């Protein structure tokens, strides 16, 4: 009589394992997808912070070099009773000027606006980021507020899907720059 080799799995046992794995994947997938989305938004916010810091470097470099040809500068603004100088650079200017190195630079558009205090009673410079990478948008959020969790949600001033920037070009007049500052202050509390 021949011995039968019973060391393998039956078809039913293999199907049961496949069904259990499928159920586990279906349960875990929404959590993993949510984590991936939050990571992408977090990376985008970090990019916004790096663009704002690059604008700080560009402004400081232009002052040291005594050049006014870097970005857009408007002097004599008054916001909330304090005097400011407006400085703005587009993201493409930051990249082409060597202030930021990006492999996927063409994916980013937008501006970084800086309101630099010119009076002694003003606290710190205000850097406002408005940018998109064709997947997410930041509209008028200050550098100090960018890292906060409240901006990792949808809504005005926050990070959200889409490609619609409120301000995609630098102000060209003092009146426009001052109006933007007042709007940023009202909507997002950037000048408090």
Question: What do the predicted segments below correspond to?
Answer:
Residues 6-33:
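N-terminal single-pass transmembrane signal-anchor helix
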Residues 67-134:
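Extracellular/periplasmic head regions of type IV pilus-like filament subunits
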Residues 117-192:
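Short, surface-exposed interaction loops/tails
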Residues 1-4:
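N-terminal secretory signal peptides that target proteins for export/translocation
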Residues 37-66:
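Membrane-proximal N-terminal amphipathic helix
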């Amino acid at each position: 009589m021949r011995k039968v080799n019973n060391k393998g799995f039956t078809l039913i046992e293999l199907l049961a394992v496949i069904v259990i794995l499928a159920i586990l994947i279906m349960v875990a997938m929404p959590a993993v997808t949510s984590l991936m989305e939050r990571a992408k938004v977090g990376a985008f916010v970090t990019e916004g912070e790096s663009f704002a810091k690059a604008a700080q470097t560009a402004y400081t470099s232009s002052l040291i070099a005594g050049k006014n040809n870097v970005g857009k500068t408007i002097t004599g603004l008054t916001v909330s009773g304090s005097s400011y100088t407006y400085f703005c650079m587009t993201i493409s200017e930051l990249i082409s000027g060597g202030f930021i190195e990006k492999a996927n630079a063409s994916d980013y558009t937008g501006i970084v606006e800086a309101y630099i205090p010119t009076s002694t009673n003003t606290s710190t410079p205000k850097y406002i980021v408005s940018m998109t990478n064709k997947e997410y948008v930041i509209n008028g959020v200050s550098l100090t507020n960018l890292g906060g969790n409240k901006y990792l949600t949808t809504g005005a001033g926050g990070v959200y899907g889409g490609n619609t920037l409120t301000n995609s070009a630098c102000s060209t007049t003092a009146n426009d720059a001052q109006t933007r500052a007042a709007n940023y202050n009202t909507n997002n509390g950037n000048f408090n």
